[in-house]
Amino acid sequence: MVLKITLSMDDMHTFHLNDGRNVNELNPKELLLYAAADCAGRTIVALLKEHISDVKLLELTLKGTLSTPSVVAESRFTSFNIIYHAECRALKEQLTISRALNLAHDKYCGLLQMLRRIAPLSHEISIVTTD
């Protein structure tokens, strides 16, 4: 079974669930995914503030594959995949955003580092310029 959490950044640089659910409605395994995606998002925002880069949209989707066909106490994560999707206004910002995404993923987000100790963590990056 695959659990999936998608977070989007609002104008105030706060992340929210995309599916309309409240955090209180998530099961503990989904909460783990939520916390890791939120940590990565906050880390990216902090890195981008240093470079005064303008991200129009930032969305993170974190998927976790479970060892069982349904969520039960014995379920263990066997792999994780995080998809970063960003939109910026200028082509020159793509490099800065890409660097921030990679730094957050590889080095600065402590919860992603923790997930790596549980199971393999892969990632995908999509950056689109809207101008």
List PLM regions with ranges:
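Extended beta-strand/beta-hairpin segments
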Residues: 1-35, 42-131
